[in-house]
A protein has these predicted regions:
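Conserved short histidine dyad/triad with adjacent acidic residue
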Residues: 38-54
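A short, N-terminal "cap"/entry segment at the start of jelly-roll beta-barrel domains
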Residues: 1-35, 80-84, 129
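Conserved hydrophobic/aromatic beta-strand scaffold that supports enzyme active sites
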Residues: 39-41, 59, 90-92
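Glycine- and acidic-residue-biased ligand/ion/polar-headgroup-sensing regions
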Residues: 55-74
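Double-stranded beta-helix
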Residues: 3, 7-11, 19, 75-77, ...
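A generic "binding-loop/recognition-motif" signal
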Residues: 46, 55-56, 97, 106
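Short acidic-glycine-tyrosine-enriched beta hairpin
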Residues: 73-96
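Short beta-strand His + acidic residue motifs that chelate non-heme Fe in jelly-roll/DSBH
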Residues: 49-51, 69-70, 91-93, 99-104, ...
């Protein structure tokens, strides 16, 4: 599969039409894959809760647009905001890092990769502040 402008535009259109202002495309071969590879289209105004992954590090690359990767401490204090643009930073978040994302430009799409099959966030993995 070539991830071209048409695919990115279609994913962005779905994100814009979604009440959550985001949409993802699963790039795995099957649910049995032992890794996750997901394209995420995120629009300004989408709310991603501060969360962590206790079983995997997470690698994040900006494919198109502009966003900030937000890193927090365990009580919800913002520790770092990392500017993400295509050809810029690539992030590898260690296991257990509290983080979120803020979209700064319409049409933003990122690639997120992590170990293991998809698991919804558990109660203790979403920071309540």
């Amino acid at each position: 599969m070539v991830i071209d402008k048409q695919i990115l535009d279609e994913l962005t259109a779905q994100a814009k039409a979604s009440p959550r202002l985001r949409m993802n495309m699963d790039l795995r071969n099957s649910q049995a894959d032992l890794s996750q590879r997901i394209l995420n289209a995120i629009e300004p105004g989408t709310v991603l809760p501060i969360h962590r992954h206790l079983n995997s590090s997470v690698t994040i690359v900006c494919i198109r647009g502009h966003f900030e990767e937000l890193i927090y401490d365990e009580i919800g204090t913002l520790v770092e905001a990392i500017d993400m643009i295509p050809g810029g930073n690539v992030i590898n978040l260690p296991i257990g890092t509290w983080h979120s994302i803020r979209s700064l430009e319409s049409g933003t799409v990122l690639l997120e990769c992590q170990d293991g099959p998809y698991e919804p966030h558990k109660e203790g993995d979403v920071l309540k502040i």
